[in-house]
Amino acid sequence: MSEPTLRVYLNALRRLYIIRDIKAWAPALRSKTPLRQAGVWHLCDPSLAAAVLETDANGLLSDLNTMGYLFESLCVRDLRVYLRPLNGEVCHYRDKNGLEADAVLRLQDGRWAAVEVKIGGEKNIEEGAANLRSLAEKVDQKRTGAPAFLMVLTGGQYAYTRPDGVHVVPLACLSH
C-alpha cells in the first residue's frame, strides 16, 4: 500500500472516531538517548476490533497477544476520559533503546505521571514497574519535575503499592 493511500485510510478512521492519535511525550532527559517522536494510534473503542475479528472472551483468551493490544487501547481510552475534566492529555513515551511507557499523563501545570499497561502476571507487573522506574530516573527532574506517580495498570483485582513506590492498580478501580 502506498503512503498516500495509507494516509487517506488513517484520516478516514480518525474522522469516524475509530482511531485516536496519541502524541509522543518529549521530556527533558539526563541522557542523550534519542526519542521516538512519532505518535501512536489507539482504538477509540476496542470492542469494535473484537467485533470485526468476530471473537468473544474465549477467543481473546486463546490469543493473549491480541487481547493485550485491545486491553491497552481500553486503558488508554479510559485514562483519556478521566483526564478530560482536568484538561490533561495522554501521551506515550518510547526512546530508541526500547524504554517505553504506554501512557504518560500530563496536566497543563506541568505535573506528569507514567503508566505501563499489563493484563496481569507478577513477571509482567515487575517488568512494567522496572520500565517506569528507569523512565523516572532518565527524566531530568530538575527541569521536568518528579512524576506525581508511577502506575502499572492491570486487569487484576487488587490495588496495592509496591515497596519501590510503584502503584499497581486494576483498571476497574479507576473512576472519577
What are these regions (language model features)?
Residues 94, 152-154:
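Short beta-strand/turn micro-motifs composed of small residues
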Residues 111-123:
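Active-site ExK catalytic segment of metal-dependent nucleases
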Residues 1-111:
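Accessory nucleic acid-recognition modules appended to NTPase machines
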Residues 86, 142-147:
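Short helix-terminating capping/connector loops at secondary-structure junctions
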Residues 114, 151-152:
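Structural beta-sheet core signal
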Residues 120-141:
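Mg2+/Mn2+-dependent nuclease catalytic core
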Residues 155-176:
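Domain-level recognition of nuclease-like catalytic cores that cleave nucleotide substrates
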Residues 51, 125-126, 159-163:
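Switch/connector loops and helix/strand junctions flanking conserved nucleotide-binding motifs
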